[in-house]
Amino acid sequence: MRVKKGYKARRRRNRVLKLAKGFRGRRKNCYRRANQAVERALDYATRDRRQKRRDFRALWIVRINAAARQNGTTYSRLLAGLKKAGVAIDRKILADLALALPGDFAAVVKAAKA
């Protein structure tokens, strides 16, 4: 007697279709298309988790550089000065300071120049 895949296959397909929820067209309800779309989406998600870190670091550097230039220095001189002064503030905090508290950022720049 032939044994069918039964509930295991259905469970696997439903898992894929659940992941494809929100997709457009046949990608949301046709298993084969949904499976391809979900695989690609998961690949992109994995890749872009790393890319997101790079993008944010670049954004922080741009913001710090812009604020540093308003205070009469450059990004590279600012970071070199901070390292020399022994000030351990990471780029994320520096960018937040530059955006939200320009006065405090100016004090940090002053400490780096000294």
Curated annotation (Swiss-Prot):
Alphabetical list of InterPro entries matching this protein: Ribosomal_bL20, Ribosomal_protein_bL20_C
Record bears the keyword Nuclease: no
Any GO CC annotation of this UniProt entry: ribosome
Alphabetized PANTHER family for the sequence: 39S RIBOSOMAL PROTEIN L20
GO BP: ribosomal large subunit assembly; translation
TM annotation in the entry: none
GO molecular function annotation: rRNA binding; structural constituent of ribosome
HAMAP family: Ribosomal_bL20 (MF_00382)
Family the entry assigns: Belongs to the bacterial ribosomal protein bL20 family.
Protein name: Large ribosomal subunit protein bL20
Entry keyword annotation includes Ribonucleoprotein: yes
Keyword field: Ribonucleoprotein, Ribosomal protein, RNA-binding, rRNA-binding
CDD domains: Ribosomal_L20
Main function: Binds directly to 23S ribosomal RNA and is necessary for the in vitro assembly process of the 50S ribosomal subunit. It is not involved in the protein synthesizing functions of that subunit.
